[in-house]
């Protein structure tokens, strides 16, 4: 378990109120996913997953998915997935996948929003994330987690705006705080964004 994962889990415990604990996850797994699926008429469901992992293998093929699925009456689904992949060598295959899927299946008066941001970082050499960078990412994760408390009062456009702002902050943090072990060079940050909506 990485130090960042431990800190994130501590953060979840500190911020947990009501449904927050089950509405978010933090992971170092290869496949990161968020799934929101309300099951009763008039219900709302929110899921957020924040992933951070290092990859020192010859293949970079991590997946990041956000799925919002609505199939009841007057319900709402919001799924947000963020994944950061720190590449620690020069791989021969780079095929990361970032997907967002929002589905409204025979749902009257329903709304579904899926947002996925994936960051692949590295210049083909070992790198380390500074303690300052870890702390800054914790703040971003906390801000994303707080969306769960207010999303019922937010429009989809407002949620998209907040996630876009969070993604911009993550990109800035990685560019500044991910340092090559030899102390030189730009780590390089590639970000993909996927958004899907259904109403």
Locate the predicted segments by residue.
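Bacterial N-terminal signal peptides
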Residues: 8-18
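Sec/Tat signal peptide C-region and signal peptidase I cleavage site
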Residues: 19-23
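Low-complexity repeat regions of mature extracellularly deployed or surface/particle-associated proteins
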Residues: 24-199
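Bacterial N-terminal signal peptides that target proteins for export
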Residues: 1-8
